[in-house]
């Protein structure tokens, strides 16, 4: 199954097994995902389902967004997300139908995608885990510098992709094969073992693990 859900990261807590073992979990609230569009091979060149979740004020919508939601006869949500579908998957879906957390009832592991916390401008020690240079032995004010970043007149440039200081975080990150500890259908909650990318209240995409 490639179909996933969009949820909101509420934070972390822990649950206990029957043996008394403490398991750290991230709580993800998964409100009903409303189908806004079904993409087909004939019209779009690929098969996918587009969903929205949450609510958004009408005054905050662009005309294009308002028209798109009106055409689907779906309440405007806080964004649009798309899931590619395999052959034969999603045959029972229609525009306006809802996807809920119970689709994960039989799923053991999940891949979670989110926008990582932004850290601003960071040096190479924090950004790339470079080791620091000597604190003493004649080293003066070069404790956290990267060191050499190139060769000599040949090639006479710094190669693309060289690990250097720069902006850290605030990028799309996926953590794979996390255990699903509990699916709470009544409260629309997913409890996933360990940490997931993003800040509290950030949107996350939960899919069945591709490497399960």
Curated annotation (Swiss-Prot):
Domain of life, source organism: Bacteria
Keyword line: Methylation, Ribonucleoprotein, Ribosomal protein, RNA-binding, rRNA-binding
GO molecular function ontology, one term from the record: structural constituent of ribosome
SUPFAM superfamilies referenced in this protein's UniProt entry, alphabetically: Translation proteins
Region (Disordered), start-end ranges: 135-156
InterPro entries in UniProt: Ribosomal_uL3 (IPR000597), Ribosomal_uL3_bac/org-type (IPR019927), Ribosomal_uL3_CS (IPR019926), Transl_B-barrel_sf (IPR009000)
Record keyword Flavoprotein present: no
GO BP: translation
Post-translational events: Methylated by PrmB.
One CC-aspect GO term: cytosolic large ribosomal subunit
N5-methylglutamine modifications at: 153
Disulfide bonds: none
Family label: Belongs to the universal ribosomal protein uL3 family.
Record-linked PANTHER family: 50S RIBOSOMAL PROTEIN L3, LARGE RIBOSOMAL SUBUNIT PROTEIN UL3C
Subunit field text: Part of the 50S ribosomal subunit. Forms a cluster with proteins L14 and L19.
Function recorded in the entry: One of the primary rRNA binding proteins, it binds directly near the 3'-end of the 23S rRNA, where it nucleates assembly of the 50S subunit.
Identification of the protein by name: Large ribosomal subunit protein uL3
Protein source organism: Tolumonas auensis (strain DSM 9187 / NBRC 110442 / TA 4)
């Amino acid at each position: 199954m490639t179909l996933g859900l969009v949820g909101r990261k509420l934070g972390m807590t822990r649950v206990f097994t029957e043996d008394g073992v403490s398991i750290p979990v991230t709580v993800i609230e998964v409100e009903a995902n409303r189908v806004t569009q079904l993409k087909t091979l004939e019209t779009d060149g690929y098969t996918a389902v587009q969903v929205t979740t949450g609510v958004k004020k009408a005054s905050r919508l662009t005309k294009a967004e308002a028209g798109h939601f009106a055409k689907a006869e779906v309440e405007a949500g806080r964004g649009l997300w798309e899931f590619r579908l395999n052959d034969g998957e999603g045959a029972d879906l229609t525009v306006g139908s809802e996807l809920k957390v119970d689709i994960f009832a039989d799923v053991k592991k999940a891949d979670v995608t989110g926008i990582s916390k932004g850290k601003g401008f960071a040096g190479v020690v924090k950004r790339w885990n470079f080791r620091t240079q000597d604190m003493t032995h004649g080293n003066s004010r070069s404790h956290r510098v990267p060191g050499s970043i190139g060769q000599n007149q040949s090639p006479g440039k710094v190669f693309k992709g060289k690990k250097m200081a720069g902006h850290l975080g605030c990028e799309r990150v996926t953590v794979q094969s996390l255990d699903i500890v509990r699916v709470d259908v009544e409260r629309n909650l997913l409890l996933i073992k360990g940490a997931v990318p993003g800040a509290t209240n950030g949107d996350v995409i939960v899919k069945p693990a591709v490497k399960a």
